[in-house]
Regions:
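Canonical AAA+ ATPase core
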Residues: 23-28, 49-53, 61-153, 193-195
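Conserved alpha-helical scaffold flanking the Walker A/P-loop in AAA+ ATPase domains
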Residues: 22-42
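Walker B catalytic acidic pair
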Residues: 44-45, 56
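Conserved AAA+ ATPase small/helical "lid" subdomain
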Residues: 133-185
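C-terminal engagement/docking regions of AAA+ P-loop ATPases
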Residues: 170-224
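Conserved P-loop NTPase mechanochemical-coupling segment
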Residues: 11-15
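Glycine-rich phosphate-binding P-loop
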Residues: 1-2, 48
Length: 224
């Protein structure tokens, strides 16, 4: 299952998580689930939502649960949040707080396509929207099984020491007010194991750490 939520200024936290509504026929309140009750949530232009609404995602992103009026609910399993944001110089945006940025596993920047890539895009759209013909390449069960196998990937103590050294270096570096938190180091561990699994290896190598350190850690730094 997937959901897309367009984030705008008048969006409320309940629009993301869900609310209890009164059912006159049953004479009781029932839960109207929000977009977080899914497997993949696309939060489009997240930094256009107000800080209060952005905070509505924090609990479900970190704890995999949603609390509505004191009652905790579990979203989908697995649960992923993919967010896009406008450039910070755009009008009407709210910078994401450090606590929320730290909950995103990876941050990628989307650059403009090359000439060849743009020509390929035009070719794909010559007849019909290619998105309409997309088919699933993996089932939910296969995805969960792959995640379980990736968790078994071996990480030598030297590799773990290497990752901690990188994190500690960010905490001591001049010009950085806040370095990588332990959550960031754990995120790097998860990513390098998954990367090694996708490369067909049962173990992590130093190049895996070097490949993923920037996309996993850079957005967590607070620079002066």
């Amino acid at each position: 299952r997937r959901q897309r939520q367009m984030c705008i200024r008048d969006r409320l936290p309940g629009d993301i998580t869900g609310i209890n509504v009164y059912d006159r026929q049953k004479n009781e309140f029932t839960l109207r689930k929000g977009p977080v009750f899914t497997n993949i949530l696309l939060a489009d232009e997240l930094n256009r939502a107000t800080p209060r609404t952005q905070a509505g995602l924090l609990e479900c992103m970190e704890e995999r649960q949603v609390t509505i009026e004191g009652v905790s609910y579990t979203p989908g399993e697995p649960f992923f949040v993919i967010a896009t944001e406008n450039p910070i110089e755009s009008a009407g945006v709210f910078p994401l707080p450090e606590a929320q940025l730290d909950r995103f596993l990876i941050k990628l920047s989307m650059n403009l396509p090359t000439k060849e890539e743009e020509l390929r895009i035009l070719e794909l759209y010559m007849e019909e929207d290619p998105l309409k013909s997309l088919t699933a390449v993996v089932s939910l069960e296969e995805l969960l099984a792959a995640r379980a196998e990736a968790a078994k990937i071996f990480v030598h103590p030297c590799i773990r020491e290497y990752m901690v050294q990188i994190a500690e270096a960010t905490r001591r570096a001049d010009g950085i007010l806040a370095g990588v938190s332990p959550r960031g180091t754990l995120g790097l561990l998860r990513c390098v194991k998954a990367y090694a699994y996708l490369q067909g290896r049962s173990y992590v190598i130093p190049d895996d750490v070097r490949t993923l350190a920037v996309p996993v850690l850079a957005h967590r730094l607070v620079c002066s």
